[in-house]
Amino acid sequence: MHRYKKEASNLIKLATPVLIASVAQTGMGFVDTIMAGGVSAIDMAAVSIAASIWLPSILFGVGLLMALVPVVAQLNGAGRQHKIPFEVHQGLILALLVSVPIIAVLFQTQFIIRFMDVEEAMATKTVGYMHAVIFAVPAYLLFQALRSFTDGMSLTKPAMVIGFIGLLLNIPLNWIFVYGKFGAPELGGVGCGVATAIVYWIMLLLLLFYIVTSKRLAHVKVFETFHKPQPKELIRLFRLGFPVAAALFFEVTLFAVVALLVAPLGSTVVAAHQVALNFSSLVFMFPMSIGAAVSIRVGHKLGEQDTKGAAIAANVGLMTGLATACITALLTVLFREQIALLYTENQVVVALAMQLLLFAAIYQCMDAVQVVAAGSLRGYKDMTAIFHRTFISYWVLGLPTGYILGMTNWLTEQPLGAKGFWLGFIIGLSAAALMLGQRLYWLQKQSDDVQLHLAAK
């Protein structure tokens, strides 16, 4: 019992800064929306559309670089800190290489917008925002590579502090470039992209400064010697991170596809769906931060050759995540009207949003289990299992079921509309929770040699 209590304490210490850093990240998007909305509805819509293209693209790169966290955590746990600089340098090189195709995709935004049938003024602003935010791509991914290093060393506070500095800088920079202050051009929504690019370069430099000057990282000597690109290691990191990157990409695009499918149901339904989805994404930060912390703890314990400790870390993470989700789900049910009223005063939208928030409460519990189980499996470097199971859950089970229930009368007398899609979310996430949980259980039942061999790849 003592080990469980100690592990819970370690987990919370790691997860709390990750949670706060996520809040800061979300806050930057919120500031962009508010500032652009202060110019016009077109500017706000343009920023929103641009974000729907930017986010899946950049998260693919982030997913690739998340592979570095368990690699560093295991080397640190094993006492082989001398090998960490090589891995970090390969991660930084991978970040630069991945930036190229992501920039190429984002640079073609005008062709993507053409398929979306967006009005000309909005399309022009969307493309302008994207061409500005393109400059943030290498900084964002290099920052993620360095953050994977510090997180892997169980130092999650630096990214938290720098994330909040980024948020504080984002506000005045948005004000300057959106509204044209201090001699800067008045760029409207495009100015949000300029501010974002500047902020991420500053955040990268701040994290680099911390790593170079930190006494807690001095023994690693991460930049004492430059390690040249090693194709074999770059391919290994890419193969390790690709399943996570693909899983993240498919998860984000799933919600984007559902938003498009819900659109023909009318503005009231779309608004209610967005209320429930936006609130759920905010609550998701809790289990997501626990999943990130579990990945670090499991990787560290496996580096120490402590498979029992890794299992305890995973199990404590699952219990903590589920307990947190049960609390947030209960609060969602009890205060669903007040939550809906935070977003809108339209009573028709509020009434439907209240119904969808009941589905969101169930969704939160399933989501917590699957994201923490996935975090545990990342610690074991069992990345491919995550991809296969989440792809089947979301795209083979969740989305088709949601479409059948929401848009057809094949299983019900009348199409259920948005409720059908939320039932699809619940079915998909429940399947993911069961399959990822089963995989984790199976892995923990294997011999120490099998577990350590998998973690060593």
Curated annotation (Swiss-Prot):
It is a multi-pass membrane protein. The keyword Phosphoprotein does not apply. It holds the Pfam family MatE. GO terms for biological process: response to antibiotic; sodium ion transport. Keywords: Antibiotic resistance, Antiport, Cell inner membrane, Cell membrane, Ion transport, Membrane, Sodium, Sodium transport, Transmembrane, Transmembrane helix, Transport. The keyword Glycoprotein does not apply. Its main location: membrane. The chain crosses the membrane at residues 30-50, 53-73, 93-113, 126-146, 159-179, 192-212, 242-262, 276-296, 315-335, 348-368, 391-411, 416-436. One of its GO terms (molecular function) is antiporter activity. GO terms for cellular component: membrane; plasma membrane. InterPro entries: MATE_fam, MATE_MdtK, MdtK-like. It is found in: Cell inner membrane. Multidrug efflux pump that functions as a Na(+)/drug antiporter. Confers resistance to norfloxacin, ciprofloxacin, ofloxacin, daunomycin, doxorubicin, streptomycin, kanamycin, ethidium bromide and acriflavine. Belongs to the multi antimicrobial extrusion (MATE) (TC 2.A.66.1) family. This is Multidrug resistance protein NorM. It comes from Vibrio cholerae serotype O1 (strain ATCC 39315 / El Tor Inaba N16961). The lineage of its organism: Bacteria, Pseudomonadati, Pseudomonadota, Gammaproteobacteria, Vibrionales. The gene is norM.
